[in-house]
Amino acid sequence: MNRLPSSASALACSAHALNLIEKRTLDHEEMKALNREVIEYFKEHVNPGFLEYRKSVTAGGDYGAVEWQAGSLNTLVDTQGQEFIDCLGGFGIFNVGHRNPVVVSAVQNQLAKQPLHSQELLDPLRAMLAKTLAALTPGKLKYSFFCNSGTESVEAALKLAKAYQSPRGKFTFIATSGAFHGKSLGALSATAKSTFRKPFMPLLPGFRHVPFGNIEAMRTALNECKKTGDDVAAVILEPIQGEGGVILPPPGYLTAVRKLCDEFGALMILDEVQTGMGRTGKMFACEHENVQPDILCLAKALGGGVMPIGATIATEEVFSVLFDNPFLHTTTFGGNPLACAAALATINVLLEQNLPAQAEQKGDMLLDGFRQLAREYPDLVQEARGKGMLMAIEFVDNEIGYNFASEMFRQRVLVAGTLNNAKTIRIEPPLTLTIEQCELVIKAARKALAAMRVSVEEA
């Protein structure tokens, strides 16, 4: 039987939500009621599948804690008042911390003037952010298209490459095994996880995947495509595969790919949605090898953990295919004033506080600690790896990784797995994490592993 719409119910629910937004604290009964409501509404109106994925990190094995507010730059507080060191970072969006005051202030000030643009008049913050990114990014990257997410930035990059290369008879894209570029149709065609791809087959034609980090496989693919007339329009890859399990390529790999792209006339698209904005110890991970892409994709941390924003930055030669008709690829909310204000403030904080260098320093400290734990617990930990504040601990099997996340939750540290590698727990904290908090995270990991070893021995 069809359910009839109810304005009264919608009004009551929205009013209840607005009341919660205004609250700063909850009493015990309000907390319990909110937890029940959130679980019920996820089950009935969001997606019940999410509940199972959020289950069992708590001591009682029930559904995950309900998030309430940021505690400090580097912590979260749940509805029960428990504070957690955030080593997940919203999958890499909180590079400048939670509710960074500079970013929040910029957004609040812009909100007081105008939240969204008219679409007809020229919006100044979009122009200023594009100029800022042209100055910040490497090489000849000059023009920016703004959107709302990482997958949108990849979609724009693929369409831009198509528009540029189609007149040249080049239509093929090469991506890499283990890659994650998003889940919209074009980005999913470049993503290499069968779980995400199979339900939506057939995807876009013309995509091939080669092993990540294997430069000879890349050369072979480019050669074969040329021989068969399937000339390559672009190679798309992540400098470090984030969702693939924080997989680092061999030194010199990006440089070699750049040379191959030049040799075969293919564009180089670098997806720095997760590695960009200081995460790996440089503003952009490609700077570790001084590699200059033709198209660069950004998102996640670009909005400072306050507003969603993505960007696709390209050279003038490539981007000029949109000059005659700038409406070939647009989005209503892309480059809106609130998002641009957040991005400009985020860049300012990253540069003023030299957070990329801090990411390198504190990342080295954390990674040294995790590698020591790997030596102490070889029966549980296979490897610790990473660069800057993008790290991973890989366990000997999937279940151990899951148990580690649960034990870390008990130690009040939030971590999570990666989408393409279930054995791997990602460590991706804010770049603002303090030295003391780094020490606490290592201490918590040691306690978690010790508890897990006891459980294994008792079993």
UniProtKB/Swiss-Prot annotation:
Instruction: Output the CDD domains linked to this UniProt entry.
Output: OAT_like
Query: Is Transferase among the key words of this record?
Result: yes
**Which top-level group of life is the source organism from?**
Bacteria
So where does pyridoxal 5'-phosphate get bound?
G150, T151, Q274, T332
Gene inactivation phenotype reads: Cells lacking this gene show a high decrease in putrescine aminotransferase activity, but are still able to grow with putrescine as the sole nitrogen source. However, a mutant lacking both patA and either puuA, puuB or puuC cannot grow with putrescine as the sole nitrogen source.
Disulfide connectivity for this sequence is none
Pathway per its UniProt entry is: Amine and polyamine degradation; putrescine degradation; 4-aminobutanal from putrescine (transaminase route): step 1/1; Amino-acid degradation
Quote the cellular component terms of the Gene Ontology held in the record.
Answer: cytosol
Enzyme category, top tier: transferase
Q: Which GO terms describe its biological process?
A: L-lysine catabolic process; putrescine catabolic process
A molecular-function term among this protein's GO annotations: identical protein binding
NCBIfam families, sorted: PRK11522.1, putres_am_tran
- Record's PANTHER family? AMINOTRANSFERASE CLASS III, PUTRESCINE AMINOTRANSFERASE
Q: What is this protein called?
A: Putrescine aminotransferase
Natural source organism: Escherichia coli (strain K12)
**Which gene is the coding source of this polypeptide chain?**
patA
